[in-house]
Amino acid sequence: VIYVFIIRSLEDVEDLVLGATILGTGGGGSPVEGFKMLKEVIDRGLEIRVVDVDELQEDSVIVSPYYVGTIAPTAKTRKPIKISNTIREAFTAMSRVLGKRISAAIATELGGGNTAVALRIAAELNIPVVDGDLLGRAAPELHQNTVHIFDLPMYPSVLVTETGNIVIVERYADIDDYESIARYLSILAGRFVAVVDTPLTIDNAKKAVVKGTISLCMKIGRAVRKARESGEDPVEAIVNGLNGWKIFEGVVAKYSWGDEGGLPYWRNLC
């Protein structure tokens, strides 16, 4: 397998998490937690190998690991923690459900937390992570996911809470019911539920994957870091890196946020 790149340094981790946070546009989990996850990977001497989906073997199976829940400061675990690595527990259960080894992981979305989730579990299990995701940014609901758009199933699915619930969804009635199941489990646990779903064949992955987005996260994060180091405008670095436009600028004078139905809500005053 020819890798697009391999992440071995904390500087690469910082660039990737920063870029994913920017491209997540406000969602996608906590970048603080994302950096912590990947720092642990680097500190353990593990490698994060990023691969183009076209480089994987035709019989490969790809799955998507992520968290559903809230990063609102009011969220708290409701019961004692029984499962420390919920994503790994879900990954192991998914492999058992499928009856085969999982070949690679893919980020469900871009964001400081959820992109890091896929990279961490891939490094821990010594499998590659696909250079891409299933959304192209972060989003609050599964409706925006490319798998749903292409009418591909996200089941079977495994959902695990740190409080000890392990739920296997063999099939769901519709995407709204599935979303509700995941949100309810996150509320039941108090903070989040770990999810591993969307087992993709290579043919289906080639339809659904938004290619190159992990590379793009690295590019944007690196551009911002270098702009800061040289005293240049980091916003201009983002605009130039994405061929975008700066619509307005201002200062956030006040903000408040909280949790409603397993989703974070916030209000900003500029």
What spans do the regions from the language model cover?
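N-terminal phosphate-binding or glycine-rich loops at protein starts, especially the Walker A/P-loop
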Residues: F5-I42
